[in-house]
Amino acid sequence: MAFAETNPAASSLPNGDCGRPRARPGGNRVTVVLGAQWGDEGKGKVVDLLAQDADIVCRCQGGNNAGHTVVVDSVEYDFHLLPSGIINPNVTAFIGNGVVIHLPGLFEEAEKNVQKGKGLEGWEKRLIISDRAHIVFDFHQAADGIQEQQRQEQAGKNLGTTKKGIGPVYSSKAARSGLRMCDLVSDFDGFSERFKVLANQYKSIYPTLEIDIEGELQKLKGYMERIKPMVRDGVYFLYEALHGPPKKILVEGANAALLDIDFGTYPFVTSSNCTVGGVCTGLGMPPQNVGEVYGVVKAYTTRVGIGAFPTEQDNEIGELLQTRGREFGVTTGRKRRCGWLDLVLLKYAHMINGFTALALTKLDILDMFTEIKVGVAYKLDGEIIPHFPANQEVLNKVEVQYKTLPGWNTDISNARTFKELPVNAQNYVRFIEDELQIPVKWIGVGKSRESMIQLF
């Protein structure tokens, strides 16, 4: 071979690879926290725990339709678009290309949290935004509301969206008419022209929509000045973080597995991939850099809005879970529907995400029950089905097979180790582990940081 002649050392290389460079996976691994049910599992709390010694905390998908609550020093912070890990003053927060950003919402959220306590001081210097992230405009949000109204009028039911413009902006993205952060900060004249075209498209689709185009552009110019120092090439930033000195990088998933656009209970889902694949596409990183994948599971099941919910308890049990768990959406304030834990759903979420461990939250909400049911199988026409149905009509028809476990009927909110939990509470956790074949790493028994019991 000519190459071998010009490179005599090549012949001594193993496998006869003639000195060709070989790509080897390397670099830091990212730790991922994902919701395993329909959202509101307590992801923010797990992220808050892990963010205490993290260097970078990332958001990879969704927008300000998510809602995370974190309590630090008795101050309750609410996050929708910002990674909740930004509460740690030593953390760099990164909003990836898969996230959709409503600029007024971003600044409003930051300013509200700054007024609550010291957790967000200096946030503007600690936030990096991918230049490839798409922008949510006010008319996307207005169109979201109109679409919901139309669904209600035409079909008698809507999707129960948060009306934050998430569906419309992802539609613009897929239609290649959306605008990104790089457009805003690089060439405002070019951005303005494209904004006018997009706004006029929306006005022609929704004749009742009123858009003050010049007024909007004036506002956006003001936001552009403020946001410009935060906008960076996200792919390059993350590559440097992965391949530079050792760093702890945390990814905070928004929404949850059963709300995923592909794998969720479609059409009652969000518009992004909130399963593990969305981490790679939403940040611009290869799958071999994904390390631990933690699934966050509430000790029972909740869902906001309409859609199939096999283990729902539309009765006193559901009401007790709702009031004890204070089940109201952080983003919408809507009451959450409540039911027993569903292991069929969790096995399905695990098939997609490959959870390495679980965080089981709000176990203390079950303190009042003398017996607790867990959904272990679905039956259709009297036969057990081995999968989680994709079709909503089919999912609505399944009959859940339950396993009844004895409750502990005692307050566990002061437990700080696994051994301090009553035996029946320990058995409940072990039953979940055995059925799912995934270890439980944390158990939540209250709202504060201290009330997360770590098992290993």
Curated annotation (Swiss-Prot):
UniProt: GTP binding residues: 39-45, 67-69, 336, 362-364, 444-447
Keyword Metal-binding (UniProt): yes
Cofactor: Mg(2+)
Pfam families listed in its UniProt record: Adenylsucc_synt
Regulation: Inhibited competitively by AMP and IMP and non-competitively by fructose 1,6-bisphosphate.
Location (main, coarse): cytoplasm
Uppermost EC category: ligase
Catalytic site: 40, 68
Subcellular location: Cytoplasm; Mitochondrion
GO biological process per UniProt: 'de novo' AMP biosynthetic process; IMP metabolic process
InterPro entries linked to this entry: Adenylosuccin_syn_GTP-bd (IPR018220), Adenylosuccin_syn_Lys_AS (IPR033128), Adenylosuccinate_synth_dom1 (IPR042109), Adenylosuccinate_synth_dom2 (IPR042110), Adenylosuccinate_synth_dom3 (IPR042111), Adenylosuccinate_synthetase (IPR001114), AdSS_2_vert (IPR027529), P-loop_NTPase (IPR027417)
Transmembrane segments: none
Alphabetical keyword list: Cytoplasm, GTP-binding, Ligase, Magnesium, Metal-binding, Mitochondrion, Nucleotide-binding, Purine biosynthesis
UniProt: IMP binding residues: 40-43, 65-68, 162, 176, 255, 270, 334
Superkingdom per UniProt: Eukaryota
Cofactor descriptive note: Binds 1 Mg(2+) ion per subunit.
Recorded catalytic activity of this chain's protein: IMP + L-aspartate + GTP = N(6)-(1,2-dicarboxyethyl)-AMP + GDP + phosphate + 2 H(+)
Listed GO MF terms: adenylosuccinate synthase activity; GTP binding; magnesium ion binding
Disordered, as annotated region: 1-24
Tissue: Widely expressed.
Binding-site residues, Mg(2+): 40, 67
Pathway where it operates: Purine metabolism; AMP biosynthesis via de novo pathway; AMP from IMP: step 1/2
Subunit structure: Homodimer.
Family recorded in the similarity comment: Belongs to the adenylosuccinate synthetase family.
Cited PANTHER family: ADENYLOSUCCINATE SYNTHETASE, ADENYLOSUCCINATE SYNTHETASE ISOZYME 2
Name of protein: Adenylosuccinate synthetase isozyme 2
Organism of origin: Sus scrofa (Pig)
Lineage: Eukaryota, Metazoa, Chordata, Craniata, Vertebrata
